């Protein structure tokens, strides 16, 4: 393994692997450091019981940006997504609420619980679809610094303001509600059935440490309407082989793009030194112009201590 790289990435979660793949495609020499035996971070597949493997953290696919799938050609590297067609919410009285991909079947199921909710559901879905389409481009923007006076940040603020102005008064009002309200309060404005509101509220708290009554969770609900699979908006699916296959495909793309790099190596401990220009691993310092840490930035420069380098079997 070389001692000098253009970039060191600490943490082989799916975000770190995507970063490594794009840097490698740009011709950079990249080293990814991972302390675990398995790459992928929360997007992993593990054998929990002998002979049975599971997606132990992240369990569905939808918010993986389609341009990443295209750029890295992930299907060629083994990514295959199976559509998620239906879900079911069991109820305390022994009944259930089903959610189906088929429009008519879904409407009949909702009408079984509430005719009013069945009538409102299409309008709700259309509005959420429109708002998700309107907001999704912002996710690809680098947010400007409102306190900066540089032309780049001032232009960014002007562009952002123009974008919101272009939404129009009505949609901007809806966006304001989605950004500030709780998912429970927002759903109360649309539906009467507790089973339906509870089912939808779950999408407002996924990935948070909040409850459905927490302000801002209405946006999390909206965010989960931004998913896309094979050009189908608001589609969700399961990765064949578990969500670890998503990370494995990204790692394979990074490895293919980086013949001069060492895509992923396993290390128990690393020490950041000299203003993020070197990371000590094992007995040798790996010099780098840039250091990225996933999921959190490294602070300080602790002493090296003892080192135990091992190549990650999931990649090498």
What are these regions (language model features)?
Residues 1-4, 273:
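Short helix-loop-beta connector
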Residues 3-147:
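N-terminal glycine-rich phosphate/pyrophosphate-binding loop and immediately adjacent elements
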Residues 6, 278, 291:
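Conserved acidic residues
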Residues 38-42, 206-209, 269-271, 300-304:
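Flexible loop/turn segments at secondary-structure boundaries
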Residues 83, 263-265:
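Short loop/edge segments at beta-strand edges and connector loops
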Residues 93-95, 211-215, 271-278:
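A short, glycine/Asx- and small/polar-enriched loop/turn
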Residues 129-257:
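Active-site/ligand-binding neighborhood in enzyme catalytic cores
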Residues 236-257, 265, 270-273, 281, ...:
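Glycine-rich loop(s) and the adjacent beta-strand/alpha-helix scaffold that form part
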């Amino acid at each position: 393994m070389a001692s000098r790289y253009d970039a060191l990435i600490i943490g082989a979660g799916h975000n770190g692997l995507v970063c490594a793949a794009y840097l490698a495609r740009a011709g950079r020499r990249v080293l990814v450091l991972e302390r675990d035996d398995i790459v992928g971070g929360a997007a992993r597949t593990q054998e929990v019981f002998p002979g049975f493997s599971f997606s132990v953290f992240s369990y569905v696919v939808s918010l993986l940006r389609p341009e990443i799938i295209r750029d890295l050609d992930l299907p060629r590297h083994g990514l295959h997504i199976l559509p998620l067609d239906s879900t079911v919410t069991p109820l305390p009285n022994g009944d259930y609420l089903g959610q189906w991909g088929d429009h008519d079947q879904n409407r009949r199921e909702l009408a079984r619980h509430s005719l009013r909710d069945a009538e409102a559901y299409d309008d709700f879905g259309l509005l959420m679809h429109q708002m998700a389409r309107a907001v999704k481009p912002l996710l690809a923007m680098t947010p400007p610094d409102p306190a900066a006076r540089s032309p780049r940040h001032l232009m960014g603020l002007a562009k952002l303001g123009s974008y919101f102005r272009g939404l129009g008064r009505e949609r901007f009002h809806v966006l304001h509600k989605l950004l500030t309200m709780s998912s429970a309060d927002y759903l109360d404005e649309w539906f009467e059935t507790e089973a339906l509101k509870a089912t939808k509220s779950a999408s407002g708290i996924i990935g948070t440490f909040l409850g459905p009554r927490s302000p801002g969770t209405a946006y999390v609900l909206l965010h989960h309407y931004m998913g896309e699979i094979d050009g189908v908006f608001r589609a969700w699916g399961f990765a064949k082989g578990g969500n670890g296959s998503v990370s494995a495909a990204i790692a394979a793309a990074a490895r293919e793009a980086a013949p001069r790099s060492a895509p992923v190596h396993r290390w128990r401990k690393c020490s950041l030194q000299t203003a993020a220009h070197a990371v000590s691993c094992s007995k040798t310092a790996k010099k780098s112009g840039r250091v990225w840490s996933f999921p959190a930035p490294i602070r300080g420069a602790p002493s090296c201590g003892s080192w135990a380098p091992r190549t990650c079997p999931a990649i090498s």
